[in-house]
Amino acid sequence: MFVYTTIMLLLLAEINHSQGCSGLCKINESPQTNIDYRICGDQITQKYTELCGNPAAGRRNRITGLDQRSIFESNLLAKRFLISRRQIVNNRRTDIVEECCAEGCKAEEVKEYCI
């Protein structure tokens, strides 16, 4: 019985491998799809910056000559932005770490997280 089970598992593994992609694959999706890379930790930050740019670059000392009213309006805009971002994040089923580190990802999937 053990030999039969082992042979069946090997055949199933070969069928799954031959149906899908070559190289790195997402195994949690049906059908299996190719991935560009599997990255974790600082590599995710580096790839995000490479594909999305640095969102903090060039923003320093950008706001000058503000009066009290424009500061208040900026505060409201910031709160609206944070609320909208929170809703987007809460609606996502996965985050970038799960997507790229655990499953592997494509460049297009990283770009979905760009602000």
From Swiss-Prot:
Family matches, as Gene3D superfamilies: Insulin-like (1.10.100.10)
Signal peptide start and end residues: 1-20
Pfam families: Insulin (PF00049)
Further facts: Negative results: the truncated synthetic analog (dimer of 27-58 and 94-115) does not bind to insulin receptor subunit B (INSR, HIR-B) and insulin-like growth factor 1 receptor (IGF1R). The truncated synthetic analog shows very weak inhibitory activity against mammalian potassium, sodium, and calcium voltage-gated channels (rKv1.2/KCNA2, hKv1.3/KCNA3, rKv2.1/KCNB1, hKv3.1/KCNC1, rKv4.2/KCND2, hKv7.2/hKv7.3 (KCNQ2/KCNQ3), hKv10.1/KCNH1/EAG1, hKv11.1/KCNH2/ERG1 and Shaker IR, rNav1.2/SCN2A, rNav1.3/SCN3A, rNav1.4/SCN4A, hNav1.5/SCN5A, rNav1.6/SCN8A, hNav1.7/SCN9A, BgNaV, hCav3.1/CACNA1G).
InterPro entries: Insulin-like, Insulin-like_sf, Insulin-rel_pep, Insulin_CS, Insulin_family
Domain comment quoted from the record: The truncated synthetic analog (dimer of 27-58 and 94-115) does not display the characteristic helical content of insulin and is largely disorded.
GO CC annotation terms, alphabetical: extracellular region
Disulfide bonds: 40-101, 52-114, 100-105
Name of the protein in its database record: Insulin-like peptide IlO1_i1
Tissue-level expression: Expressed in tentacles.
GO molecular function: hormone activity
UniProt keyword list: Disulfide bond, Ion channel impairing toxin, Secreted, Signal, Toxin
Propeptide: 59-93
Its job: Heterodimer with unknown function. Surprisingly, the truncated synthetic analog (dimer of 27-58 and 94-115) does not bind to long insulin receptor (HIR-B) and insulin-like growth factor 1 receptor. This truncated synthetic analog shows very weak inhibitory activity on different voltage-gated channels.
Family, as annotated: Belongs to the insulin family.
Cellular compartment(s): Secreted
